[in-house]
Amino acid sequence: MHYYLIEARAPLYSVKVVDVYQVASAYPLPTPHAVVGALGAAMAHAGMCRGLQCMKEAEGLVVAARPAAVGELAKFPAVLWRTRGVLEDKSLPAGLEDYAGARDAMVREYVYAHAVKILLVTRKRVPQHVIRLMARLGDSESYVSVVDVLEGKPRECGGLVNVAVRAAKARRGSYTLYRALDERGNRELFAYPVVEEGGVYRRGGVEVGSKVLCLGEAVFPEGDGW
């Protein structure tokens, strides 16, 4: 296995909670599948594959792609205006009246955080220059820049886990449950190691019933299936 701790920065990001529509609630941290999608897009930019094949290759390559809670973050709503029918009809509205009728709005939550850190575990080594091409974590406004990639062998440590884990793995701790898409796009119940206090999400922790490993600031369970 190959282990990476990725640090990304962004003005804001939004990964929509599954099963919501008009008010698009956002996860406080990116989902595993969003990270896999970002890696697949990076592989395409690097010329390693093309189109949907990149997503399939990324899904087969990644063992775990889990966000790590390392600091405070805040969510806030924003109103997004969209022009409907442009892609479907392959044309712009003919006039002002048509344009007004084609406009629609929705409320979407966004997240502000100083940095986003992600633990990535892969079956084969991924060149760091490919990881640094990861450019989006979420919707079309969720652009990020990868500023650091720590590659190394994790060491045995202890304490509470600070990455998202499957809820069945959690014994106790301070965390929030979310149903989200895992690395293969399947719906799973995850324990996110964050808790909301006064409108701000703060770092929590999850106690698991196995040995714990550390890579940089990421603390995660040993083995797989978590």
Curated annotation (Swiss-Prot):
GO BP of this protein: defense response to virus; maintenance of CRISPR repeat elements
Keywords: Antiviral defense
Keyword Ribonucleoprotein applies: no
Induction note: Repressed by 5 J/m2 ultraviolet light and 50 mM NaCl, slightly induced by 20 J/m2 ultraviolet light, 100 and 150 mM Nacl. Member of the csa5-cas7-cas5a-cas3-cas3'-cas8a2 operon.
UniProt cross-references to NCBIfam families, sorted A to Z: cas_cas5a, CRISPR_cas5
Subunit structure of this chain's protein: Can form a Cascade complex with Csa5, Cas7, Cas3, Cas3' and Cas8a2.
Recorded family membership: Belongs to the CRISPR-associated protein Cas5 family. Subtype I-A/Apern subfamily.
Functional summary from the UniProt entry: CRISPR (clustered regularly interspaced short palindromic repeat) is an adaptive immune system that provides protection against mobile genetic elements (viruses, transposable elements and conjugative plasmids). CRISPR clusters contain spacers, sequences complementary to antecedent mobile elements, and target invading nucleic acids. CRISPR clusters are transcribed and processed into CRISPR RNA (crRNA).
Name listed for the protein in its UniProt record: CRISPR-associated protein Cas5
This protein's encoding gene: cas5a
